[in-house]
Amino acid sequence: MDTYFLPISALQHYAYCPRQFALIHVEQAWEENYFTADGRRLHERVDDGEPEQRKGIRYERSVLLRSEKHLIAGKMDLLEVHLEEPRKYFPVEYKRGKPKIEDWDRIQLCAQALCIEEMQGTTVTEGAIWYWETRQRETVPIDANLRTHTLDIIQTAYKIRQAGHTPPPTENKRRCRACSLKNLCQPDIYRQDRSASYIEELFADEKIA
C-alpha cells in the first residue's frame, strides 16, 4: 500500500475545526462558497508568477514540498531564497483574509518550514504570511512552541484519518457561519440531536486522544 501523505493545507482545516478536517479528508466532502472561491483565485494569481531574482534573493513560486519524516506534502505559494552563504530559506504563504489571533495560518506555514528543513538540510527560523484584506505581511517566528503545536496537529489529524472518525462540530458557532461545509455538516442539528451524545458516550473508550 502506498504511504499516505497528509496535505499541508489539511492542517489548517484541522486547526480551524477537526470536524471540517474529517469531512474533507475522511469523508471526501467539499462545497465551495465565496470565501473559498476568492481564496482559490488569490492562490491562482500568486502561483502564476514566474521565478525571479532581485538583490541577492531568488523568488520561487508554487514550490512542491514533501516530508518523509512527518508524512506531509503540499505546495507553497512563495519561497524566498537568500543567496548569501549560508543560504536562508524564507517561506511565504498568501491568505485572503486578515491576521488572526489563532495559529491556524501559522501552523500551515510551520509545516512548510518543516518540509524545507528536511529537503534542504537547513533550519528555517522564520517565514511570513501575506494577508490580502489588509495588504500586510506578518513575519512569523518558527519557534519551539509553534513547532510543537504543529507536530501535535499532524499526529492527531493522522489518527483521525486512520480511524475514519468524524468529530463533533466545534463549540465556537461563529466559525460555522463562514464554513463552506455548513450545509453538509449541519452543526446545529448535530448539537440538538441527543443521540449524538449517546453515541459519543458509547464509544468514549475508543475516542482518539
Where are the language model's segments positioned?
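Metal-dependent nuclease catalytic cores that hydrolyze phosphodiester bonds in DNA/RNA
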Residues: 1-91, 95, 199-209
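Non-catalytic, well-ordered alpha-helical scaffold segments
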Residues: 8-9, 76, 106-110, 173-177
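Mg2+/Mn2+-dependent nuclease catalytic core
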Residues: 55-156
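Metal-dependent nuclease catalytic regions and adjoining charged, substrate-binding loops involved
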Residues: 68-69, 118-209
